[in-house]
């Protein structure tokens, strides 16, 4: 029998996240909303991130066997929904740190894990991590044979790797002071000559390397080897930092190479982004849930000049019903996806497809949910004294970031479906090929 009842530890994780969101995160807006630019708003959230560390929310991004407190990805999804239902500021910085740690968590080097995860399980300070993958010219087709590939390159020189190139959008990558994150996993294309284009006859996946860069690494380089060129001003998520960064002959010790370059490194990156894809669904649910809850309260307390609360009008109720159904189905899909990702009996392609369809569905319908909540409320929802304008700007980002639904996530799912041995129901029933004879 399928059981959706939360375990005691999952209920406790939800309670803890709710308490933090309601007592700490609710105060964040008053601090960052007066700031005039993206970086200043990001920096204004630093005390709240420090509180997140102190409350164990960063340690909760690391699995228990590696010194953290994360029991499962289901626990993580529950936590994220509660945080994003209240305030994305700091919450998105926590998520970005989790993504930044993911390649290290997934690697098979206990020594690297012990060394680089240590600051994040200490419960002290404000350590930031970042997965530096995205580039100014886009990375949706970074593994397409015959394409230019990643423009951030790395070449081996003696006992070091030398990085050259630019990154744009990786959250947390500049750190609090633009002197770098405490840990950045920089995804590069191996090339002996950065000025030469990628060989069109070579599989790009075989040329990938991940190098671990710390603030100490940056400090040990020449000043112009690491530069922040700018910070995008965003319509929503106005407290996140994902600056435009340039590496110029930037030296990294060979011991900071995460794993053997090539398919193994590419696999770590793909797995990290598959896990984050499912968890973005929880973030989207939190934001859409906030819109639904505000619209529901409004509909049950306001008449809009009539004789009864607007919830009594069928058109309003229908919009709220649609929102509720989308939220419930999205949550179940997220829970199924993260459970599938942790099921060792399933093939990777099955896990990947489940994560992709979760990211696509949940983030797309979250946008619809916020818009329908606004329609239920009416013109009042467009006023800034309500949460809807902010929620709309935030929810619009989810289908676009962490691998855009159109350019990347649907294409990943398409490739899985096109496989000759594709089994559409493997994540639910195990191996179960479609009987073509009856079709």
Curated annotation (Swiss-Prot):
Binding site for FAD: 131-134, 139-141, 169-171, 304, 313-314, 375-379, 400-404
Entry superkingdom: Eukaryota
Cited SUPFAM superfamilies: Acyl-CoA dehydrogenase C-terminal domain-like (SSF47203), Acyl-CoA dehydrogenase NM domain-like (SSF56645)
Functional pH dependence: Optimum pH is 8.0.
GO MF term (any one): nitroalkane oxidase activity
Modulation of this protein's activity: Strongly inhibited by mercury chloride and KCN.
Record carries keyword Transit peptide: no
Catalytic residues, chain numbering: 402 (proton acceptor)
Biophysicochemical property: temperature dependence: Optimum temperature is 40 degrees Celsius.
Enzyme kind, highest EC tier: oxidoreductase
Chemical reaction(s) catalysed: a primary nitroalkane + O2 + H2O = an aldehyde + nitrite + H2O2 + H(+); a secondary nitroalkane + O2 + H2O = a ketone + nitrite + H2O2 + H(+)
Purpose of the protein: Catalyzes the oxidative denitrification of neutral nitroalkanes, including 3-nitro-2-pentanol, 1-nitropropane, 2-nitropropane, nitroethane and nitrocyclohexane, and may thereby protect the organism against toxic compounds. Has no detectable acyl-CoA dehydrogenase activity.
Subunit structure: Homotetramer.
Protein name: Nitroalkane oxidase
Organism: Fusarium oxysporum
